[in-house]
Design a protein with these regions (language model features):
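Active-site loop-to-helix junction immediately N-terminal to the catalytic Tyr of the SDR YXXXK motif
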Residues: 93, 139-147, 158
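C-terminal helical subdomain
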Residues: 172-173, 192-238, 242
Length: 250
């Protein structure tokens, strides 16, 4: 159960994966729910059985973010929306891959926070939850996606300092490989996508939702800053050492 001081929550990327699983957790809480996504067809079906508000929005549209979110009175913002385009690295990513993924994975987070956090400061309560990644904490062969999630890590850390004394909390959730649609958007080659999402038991969206809800459950004096969550069979941090074949020496 989340801390009772929170009366409203906004979840971005709420129609699938981690966002959808997190949304479902709030159905058991006494809280006003706002579920945001570009495609709301799944949310419309879910709303037939559960009470919550749907916000249809394209997070690539900065003006729309401010127009629709600035007047909302939100106690918890869960910035979860994201895309894996460009995850194969800067050499394989197209210019469009880089622009699109940076817009959603980094810029939309900043604009969403800019629109909502002032209300939290005014009320002297609130909780910001940012979806990071192990790719943002440990070097991997993913300079585009890893760089973007590295930016989220620094944003989370710096925002905590910026909000010091406001009683607004900031938590970053950093999952390892999770059974979502990430692989499909990250790799143009279906076989590579399948290989990326195999080889060991992946995390599931409910595992990440557990971590999010835990960060929201602690007493007001506690702030869960960063949660790293990886599969039991996944050990982040190590990278393979690949000898360079120098044509001059061979």
């Amino acid at each position: 159960m989340i801390n009772k001081i929170y009366k409203s929550v906004l979840i971005t990327g709420a129609s699938s994966g981690i966002g959808l699983e997190t949304l479902k957790r709030f159905f058991n809480e006494n809280i006003i729910i706002y579920a945001l996504d570009k495609d709301v067809s799944k949310l419309e079906k879910l709303k037939r059985k559960h009470k919550f508000n749907i916000i249809q929005m394209n997070l690539f549209d900065t003006d729309e973010i401010y127009n629709k979110l600035s007047n909302l009175k939100i106690d918890i913002i869960i910035c979860n929306a994201g895309i894996g385009r460009g995850a194969e690295g800067i050499l394989k990513a197209s210019r469009e891959d880089i622009e699109v993924s940076t817009k959603l994975n980094v810029e939309s987070y900043l604009h969403t926070l800019k629109a909502i956090v002032p209300w939290m400061i005014k009320r002297r309560k609130g909780h910001v939850v940012l979806m990071g990644s192990l790719a943002g904490l440990y070097p991997q062969i993913s300079s585009v996606y890893g760089g973007q999630k590295g930016a989220i890590h620094r944003i989370a850390q710096s925002l905590r300092i910026e909000l010091s004394g406001s009683r607004v909390k900031v938590s970053e959730i950093c999952p390892g490989r999770t059974k979502t649609n990430f692989g499909k958007s990250a790799f143009k080659n279906k076989d590579k996508a399948k290989k990326f999402m195999s080889g060991f038991t992946l995390l599931e969206p409910r595992d990440i939702a557990d971590a999010i809800m835990f960060s929201l459950s602690v007493r007001w004096r506690s702030n869960i800053s960063t949660i790293e969550i990886s599969g039991t069979e996944q050990s982040p941090g190590g990278v393979p050492i690949i000898p360079v074949k120098d044509p001059i020496l061979s």
